Amino acid sequence: GYSSAASDVYKRQFIHFIKYGRGIFMDISSKKEFDLYKDIQNRTDGEVYLGIVGPVRTGKSTFIKRFMDLMVLPYMEDVHSRQRTIDELPQSAQGKTIMTTEPKFIPKDAAEIALEDDTRIKIRLIDCVGFMVDGATGHMEGSTDRMVHTPWFDHEIPFVEAASIGTEKVIRDHATIGIVVTTDGSIGDLPRENYVNAEEQTVQELEEIGKPYVVVLNSTRPYSEETVRIAEGLREKYQTAVLPVNCEQLRKDDVFHILEQILYEFPVARMEFYIPKWTEMLPPDHPMKAEIIQSARTILGGMRKVKDIYAQDFTPEHYVSRMKLEEVDLASVSYTHLRAH
């Protein structure tokens, strides 16, 4: 058949998530849900790095703390490592003042989780300052820029510049998956419009390097009509999943849903087309074979990410009576079987 290969390592991670439905994610103690962690382990060589990025003052640190409380700390066997990880959790607070001052790995050393069959997986989240927004404070000292030392220069640089560089490095160099945390403006004193430029900058960085990502819309009222409307607008704007949640009240099923949606943002690695054997004997310029080839090209042209598989129109052409999507194999490298009759 015809195939479309993907080369980037990011295109092969977390693909196995979709194998299980969202419904089984509610009780992490079940064997199938430990299998979920095992699948992640297989896809990432045992190390999962989630880059929590976005504008400043959106709740990134709050998201990290809740994620660790729900998904990591309860499954750490070593008491001392667990306590050390708790001590390393980021601070968060209400208001306009920037709390995070530099990129930070949470935990400092990746937390190792033991699964039922002695499989082990390392998980680490990466916090960052974020891109600056109008109205935030903490980046100035009086009327001058706050100067800070960074690992990247041998001299002080302005806080805003350091925050931008650090955030870009998290996106480009450290994270395997991006979670963009933004807000509808309900979580603090800054209005929604103040976050838009920094939000767009974050998404642009992720799009440029092709890393899979989703957007978390932090809100004190995630189910309100206004928040849902904003989420739908962002979905249309960025062409990616946007999930309204309250980061302070993040639940386990929220986390699983976020990870599940990330899966749909991974590129399709390969497509296989199956046609009747006898058509393979036809010359390439035969009208029937030419139409089949053109149909394959059309489908491939609209198939970039996993989510595109389910949005694709497999309407048959003149010579093809039926086209059937037979299999979406997400257990290895995410490929699709499409059979024409």
Which sequence ranges carry the predicted segments?
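Single conserved hydrophobic/aromatic residue that forms the stacking wall/gate
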Residues: 1-13, 337-341
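Conserved, well-folded catalytic cores of nucleic-acid-processing
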Residues: 70, 131-132, 205, 209, ...
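Conserved C-terminal guanine-recognition region of P-loop GTPase G domains, centered on the G4
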Residues: 155-237
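A solvent-exposed, charged loop/short amphipathic helix patch at secondary-structure junctions
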Residues: 139-157
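Conserved G1/Walker A P-loop phosphate-binding module
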Residues: 31-143
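Canonical P-loop GTPase G-domain recognition
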Residues: 220-277
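Short, Lys/Arg-enriched N-terminal segments with co-localized hydrophobic residues
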Residues: 7-25
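P-loop NTP-binding site
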Residues: 28, 44, 48-50, 57, ...
